[in-house]
Regions:
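Hydrophobic alpha-helical topogenic segments used for membrane insertion/localization
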Residues: 2-26
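A short loop-to-beta-strand scaffold at the N-terminal edge of the catalytic core in hydrolase folds
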Residues: 42-56
């Protein structure tokens, strides 16, 4: 074996070992604060994985659907859950691939979320409900409503993305990125870097919050844990 080839193998092995060690470190530390509680909820067994949800209050059924970002979860609604529960039976859901729900290595599409939302309303809620959706989750909620018109009574969309953005078809670059992310070790390493605390803090400062003084470390930690939970 040539020295250059042997050196390349050694460097490659060291790099893979380093990425594996980093991934293990992230896995062990991400949920150590245990901010995403599971004892206050239930799991709905869907065909592609278990979906975590909570149910609170009594009254008109209300479904709260968080953003489809993997850092998001039903905890987005924690500040208003108690107030909404006074007159409603409030359901929060962690979409597949987010929060406390399973994170299978599958292709995540808007239509998949449509299927999840439709199945959840039919199987768990059991009747037409009001729904509130944020950002990217607005699209599957509207699609679900269009496909099954008796699914929702009232629909509220918070900061929905522009229709022009929803109309975009995944190109080769986005498909390649998805393929890379799904790779073992290397893909997980890239994902962990993209979902690092530093990246998350920048996201809050540049996109989520107009005033940085409103950003709390607990909220950031919850989003970080959601991205790595399970």
């Amino acid at each position: 074996m040539r020295k250059s080839t042997k050196r390349l193998l050694v460097l490659t092995s060291a790099a893979v070992a380093g990425m594996y060690a980093y991934n293990r470190l992230v896995d062990s530390n991400a949920a150590r604060k245990n901010l995403l509680k599971v004892d206050n909820g239930h799991y709905y067994k869907w065909k592609e994985g278990n979906i975590f949800y909570t149910q609170n209050g009594t009254g008109t059924p209300l479904l709260l659907v968080h953003d489809t970002d993997s850092r998001a979860s039903g905890e987005e609604w924690s500040k208003i859950l108690k107030k909404l529960s006074k007159k409603n039976t409030v359901y929060t859901i962690d979409l597949l691939g987010c929060g406390r729900s399973d994170k299978p290595s599958i292709k995540y599409t808007n239509y998949m979320y449509v299927q999840i939302i439709t199945a959840f309303v039919n199987d768990v809620i059991g009747e037409a409900c009001d729904v509130v959706a944020t950002n990217l989750s607005a699209a599957p909620v509207l699609m679900a409503s269009a496909l099954q018109k008796d699914l929702f009574n009232k629909t509220i969309l918070i900061n929905p993305v522009p229709l022009q953005q929803l109309n975009q078809i995944p190109d080769k670059a986005s498909k390649f990125k998805q393929t890379v992310i799904n790779l073992p070790i290397f893909g997980t390493f890239i994902y962990n870097k993209l979902m690092s605390p530093l990246k998350l803090d920048l996201l809050f400062r540049n996109k989520y919050m107009l005033r940085s003084q409103l950003i709390s470390s607990k909220v950031e930690d919850t989003y970080y844990e959601s991205a790595h939970h399970g």
